[in-house]
């Protein structure tokens, strides 16, 4: 199962600017007047020759036509094979994939007239099949391509924005610091870098047909880093699963682990399949800018990614089993805390891996296919946003810490720049904050007899509410 939806969107947008012309007035026995990029043209020609060989073999194996009345003989039209067709019938097949801008969901038609003769184009009086819809970029297709293009840009831009905020939160609030947050920050960084690379590719490479034709090394280097960062995304998620599994199942709630092995797995291991893919791609499928997805070499990268997703999912299932057992036996609060962390990871594993499972079953219906495309592009391009939302913004500990800091800031701001609140106001603020479960600090200032210092801040201090409550009870 190929992780190819993103690159198909890129290729479609590029090819909208450089379609392979199919002249309705020309015979299908000739190749397009303007060739696609050289390497893909060679691949397409091999596919064409293979289809021709299979067609002639099929025509020899099929029995003679058994119908009544005139009919058109089986034939090879130069691009596709056509069986015996009754007179007056319009035959059709799906477009071939010889050329990168041909849409396999569109149809080729060939008409057998009433006399049993294949239709001939009036321009040159040669047998003609209608391939015009294969690369006919209608306004609807153009609009769809632009929508997917800008959806990708918006998704990755939003991902970068939310991930940077999340990193800032984890950096500023040291009380959130722990080993698992360190894993979060590394995973966030991979998504930020990956989104930046994709945006560069979308803005600088995809619309630039001349750059793709020149095929500079920098274009392929950019693709290499995209594949590397994409792999890092999933292997850092595997690190999250391994960490929780070791913490809960293996080490029995051990507090510290050696993170160097996680760095090696998250940053180091993805280099292996990515480097192997780059070498084999350069040798066996060296297309321009490595934009084509019509190669099984992509499994070199996507195979380990899929394996990481499967292993991670089984890790998390085992973690849930252990936690449920412990909660039934001991009702430990710590188990509940870890279970929340596991739930967040379990949500992300199928969410971020769904394209590997669902992609092969794209509906053939145009409307359903379009819905599928929008859904899959949303899941793929907004991955960073989902990661930041689930791991940071929806995290109860993060929310509590931010709320606590905000309440402290407002109280200190009011005391420094605003009027001193009455005792009733302070008590009401403390009570409302305490009801929300937020540890609150109040501003306490000893009264002074010296009018000159009545508005000063000397002698003021921030006193936790629990200290005041202890003194009151005493």
Curated annotation (Swiss-Prot):
Gene, per the UniProt record: CALCR
Segments on the Cytoplasmic side according to the record's topology features: 170-181, 243-259, 321-340, 395-474
Protein known as: Calcitonin receptor
Family, per entry: Belongs to the G-protein coupled receptor 2 family.
Gene Ontology CC annotations of this record: axon; plasma membrane
Gene source species: Oryctolagus cuniculus
Record-level Gene Ontology MF annotations: calcitonin binding; calcitonin receptor activity
Biological process, per Gene Ontology: adenylate cyclase-activating G protein-coupled receptor signaling pathway; cell surface receptor signaling pathway; positive regulation of cytosolic calcium ion concentration
Glycosylated residues, chain numbering: 28, 73, 125, 130
């Amino acid at each position: 199962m190929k992780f190819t939806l993103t690159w198909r969107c890129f290729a479609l947008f590029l090819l909208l600017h450089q379609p392979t012309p199919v002249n309705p007035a020309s015979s299908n026995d000739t190749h397009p007047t303007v060739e696609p990029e050289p390497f893909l043209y060679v691949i397409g020609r091999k596919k064409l020759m293979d289809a021709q060989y299979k067609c002639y073999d099929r025509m020899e194996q099929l029995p003679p036509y058994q119908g009544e009345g005139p009919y058109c003989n089986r034939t090879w039209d130069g691009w596709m094979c056509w069986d015996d067709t009754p007179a007056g019938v319009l035959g059709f097949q799906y477009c071939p994939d010889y050329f990168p801008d041909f849409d396999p969901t569109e149809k080729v038609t060939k008409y057998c007239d009433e006399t049993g003769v294949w239709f001939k184009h009036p321009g040159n009086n040669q047998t003609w099949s209608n391939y015009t819809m294969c690369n006919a970029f209608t306004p609807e297709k153009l609009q769809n391509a632009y929508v997917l293009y800008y959806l990708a840009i918006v998704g990755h831009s939003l991902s970068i924005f939310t991930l940077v905020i999340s990193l800032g939160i984890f950096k500023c609030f040291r009380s959130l610091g722990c080993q698992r947050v360190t894993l979060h920050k590394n995973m966030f960084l991979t998504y930020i870098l990956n989104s930046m690379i994709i945006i560069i590719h979308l803005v600088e490479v995809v619309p630039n047909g001349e750059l793709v034709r020149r095929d500079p090394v920098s274009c392929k280097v950019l693709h290499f880093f995209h594949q590397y960062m994409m792999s890092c995304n999933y292997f850092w998620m595997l690190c999250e699963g391994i960490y929780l599994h070791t913490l809960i199942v293996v080490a029995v709630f051990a507090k510290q682990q050696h993170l160097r092995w996680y760095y090696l797995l998250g940053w180091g291991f993805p280099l292996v399949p990515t480097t192997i893919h780059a070498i084999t791609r350069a040798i066996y499928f060296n297309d321009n800018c490595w934009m084509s997805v019509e190669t099984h070499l992509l499994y070199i990268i996507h195979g380990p990614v899929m394996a990481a997703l499967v292993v991670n999912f089984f890790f998390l299932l085992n973690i849930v089993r252990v936690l449920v057992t412990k909660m039934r036996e001991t009702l430990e609060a710590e188990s509940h805390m870890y279970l929340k962390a596991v739930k967040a990871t379990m949500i992300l594993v199928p969410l971020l891996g769904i394209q590997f499972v669902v992609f092969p079953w794209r509906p053939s219906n145009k409307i359903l296919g379009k819905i599928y495309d929008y859904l899959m592009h949303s899941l793929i391009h907004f991955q960073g946003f989902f990661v930041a939302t689930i791991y940071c913004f929806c995290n109860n500990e993060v929310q509590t810490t931010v709320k606590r800091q905000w309440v402290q800031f407002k109280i200190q701001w009011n005391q420094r720049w605003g009027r001193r609140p009455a005792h009733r106001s302070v008590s009401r603020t403390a009570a409302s904050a305490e009801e929300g479960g937020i540890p609150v600090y109040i501003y306490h200032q000893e009264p002074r007899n010296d009018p000159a210092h009545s508005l000063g801040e000397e002698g003021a201090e921030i006193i936790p509410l629990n200290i005041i409550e202890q003194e009151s009870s005493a």
